[in-house]
UniProtKB/Swiss-Prot annotation:
GO terms for molecular function: auxin efflux transmembrane transporter activity; identical protein binding; protein homodimerization activity. Disulfide bonds: none annotated. Expressed in roots, leaves, shoot apex and panicles. This is Probable auxin efflux carrier component 5c. It is a multi-pass membrane protein. Keywords: Auxin signaling pathway, Membrane, Transmembrane, Transmembrane helix, Transport. May act as a component of the auxin efflux carrier. Belongs to the auxin efflux carrier (TC 2.A.69.1) family. It comes from the Eukaryota. The chain crosses the membrane at residues 7-27, 40-60, 70-90, 107-127, 138-158, 230-250, 254-274, 289-309, 315-335, 349-369. One of its GO terms (biological process) is auxin polar transport. It comes from Oryza sativa subsp. japonica (Rice). InterPro entries: Auxin_eff_plant (IPR014024), Auxin_Efflux_Carrier (IPR051107), Mem_transp_PIN-like (IPR004776). It is found in: Membrane.
Length: 370
C-alpha cells in the first residue's frame, strides 16, 4: 500500500529533474547565457557523451542471466503492437509523397509517445512502494532492454527517415521546410503536418535500398549510443558469468560521465523550452494526443501483450503500470538531435511527468480490484 512517505520519495526523485529544467530555461529566457547554436551543441554533447556513458553504466549493472524473460517478452509484444499500429496508420494516409512522408515521421513520434517511458526516475521508487523489491527489479530489467534494444531501433528509424524522407546527407535536401515556419522551429520537420516537396520533385529523394541500408548501418555503427548498449550487454554477460568486475579507476571514469545523463538531458530540454514562444510549445491538441498515447494507448497495448504471454496477478498489474510511466527523457534528446517534433516530446516529458503521479496511483487503485 502506498503511504505519504512513499509519495514523498517519488516526488523527491522527480523534483531534481525540474531543477535542472528550470536552470536550462532560465539560462536562455532570462539570463541569455547561450545562443541557439550553443544550445544545439549542448544537446549534441548529451547525445554523444552523457547518454552513451549513462546507458553503458546502467546496462553493466544488470545480471542478464536473472531476467524475467516472460515479462520482457510481454513488453516486446506491446511495443511491436505500437509499431504495427503506427505503421498501419501511416500506410492509410493518402495524398502526395510529401503527405506520406509526414505520416511516416509522425509514426516515429507516435511510437515514442506510446512505448518509451521513464522507468528509472519515477518507476523504480513508485513500483517499489506499490509492490516491493521484486517489482523494482523487474522495472529495472525492462529499462535495460529499452536502452539496449528499443532506443537503438528508434535511432535506426531516425536515420532511415533522414535518408528516405529528408533526402540523406547532413540536412534537408530536396525536401524543404515551409517558408512560413518560424526560425526557431526550422529543425522540427513536419510541425504542421508534412514536408513540403521541392518544385518539380516528390517528397524527397528516394535512395536505392542497399545504398540507404549501407548508409544507415554505417551511421548506426558510429553512434556511441548503439555500441554503448552492445558493449554493456557483452560485458554484463562476461562479468556475471565469470564473476568479474571492472577496475575501480574504470568504474569511476564511467560514472563521472554517466551521472550527467539525466541532469544534462533535462537541462537541454530547458534550453529548448527557453527558445520557444510558449512553455507548452506544441499546443493543446497535440498535448492531449501525446497524453492519450502515453497514459492510455501504451497501457492498453501492454495489457494485450501481457495477456498474450499469460501474465497474471501482480505481475500483470506491474506491467500495465510501468507502461503508464511518464515519457522517456532520452526520447526528447534524440528527437531534438534529429529535428523531429522535439516540441511534442518536450511537452510530453514536462507535462506528463507532472500529472503522472495521480494517474499512476489511480491505475494502482483500479487494478487492485481486478
Amino acid at each position: 500500500m502506498i503511504g505519504w512517505g512513499d509519495v514523498y520519495k517519488v516526488v523527491g526523485a522527480m523534483a531534481p529533474l525540474y531543477f535542472a529544467l528550470g536552470l536550462g530555461y532560465g539560462s536562455v529566457r532570462w539570463w541569455r547565457f547561450f545562443t541557439a547554436e550553443q544550445c544545439a551543441a549542448i544537446n549534441t554533447m548529451v547525445v554523444y557523451f552523457s547518454m552513451p556513458f549513462f546507458t553503458f553504466d546502467f546496462v553493466v549493472r544488470t545480471d542478464p542471466f536473472a531476467m524475467n524473460y516472460r515479462v520482457i517478452a510481454a513488453d516486446a509484444v506491446s511495443k511491436a503492437i505500437a509499431i504495427a499500429a503506427m505503421a498501419a496508420w501511416a500506410r492509410t494516409r493518402c495524398g502526395c509523397a510529401a503527405a506520406k512522408a509526414g505520416a511516416q515521421s509522425w509514426s516515429i513520434t507516435g511510437f515514442s509517445l506510446a512505448a518509451l517511458n521513464n522507468t528509472l526516475v519515477v518507476g523504480v521508487p513508485l513500483l517499489d512502494a506499490m509492490y516491493g523489491r521484486w517489482a523494482q527489479d523487474l522495472v529495472v530489467q525492462i529499462a535495460v532492454v529499452q536502452s539496449m534494444v528499443w532506443f537503438p531501433l528508434l535511432l535506426m528509424a531516425f536515420e532511415l527517415r533522414k535518408a528516405w524522407v529528408v533526402g540523406g546527407g547532413g540536412g534537408v535536401g530536396p525536401a524543404v521546410m515551409s517558408s512560413s515556419s518560424p526560425p526557431e522551429k526550422q529543425s522540427d520537420v513536419e510541425m504542421n503536418g508534412a514536408v513540403v516537396a521541392a518544385p518539380g520533385g516528390g517528397g524527397g529523394v528516394r535512395l536505392p535500398f542497399w545504398a540507404t541500408a549501407r548508409t544507415v548501418g554505417l551511421k548506426l555503427a558510429r553512434n556511441p549510443n548503439v555500441y554503448a548498449s552492445v558493449l554493456g550487454v557483452v560485458w554484463a554477460c562476461i562479468a556475471y558469468r565469470w564473476h568479474l568486475s571492472l577496475p575501480g579507476i574504470v568504474t569511476g571514469s564511467l560514472q563521472v560521465m554517466s551521472r550527467t545523463g539525466t541532469g544534462m538531458s533535462m537541462f537541454s530540454m530547458g534550453l529548448f523550452m527557453g527558445q520557444q514562444e510558449r512553455v507548452i510549445a506544441c499546443g493543446a491538441g497535440l498535448t492531449a494526443l501525446g497524453m492519450a498515447l502515453r497514459f492510455v494507448a501504451g497501457p492498453l497495448a501492454t495489457l494485450v501483450g501481457a495477456a498474450a504471454l499469460g501474465l497474471r496477478g501482480d505481475v500483470l498489474h506491474l506491467a500495465i503500470i510501468q507502461a503508464a510511466l511518464p515519457q522517456s527523457i532520452a526520447s526528447f534528446v534524440f528527437a531534438k538531435e534529429y529535428g523531429l517534433h522535439a516540441d511534442v516530446l518536450s511537452t510530453a516529458v514536462i507535462f506528463g511527468t507532472l500529472i503522472s503521479l495521480p494517474i499512476l496511483i489511480a491505475y494502482y487503485a483500479v487494478l487492485g480490484f481486478v
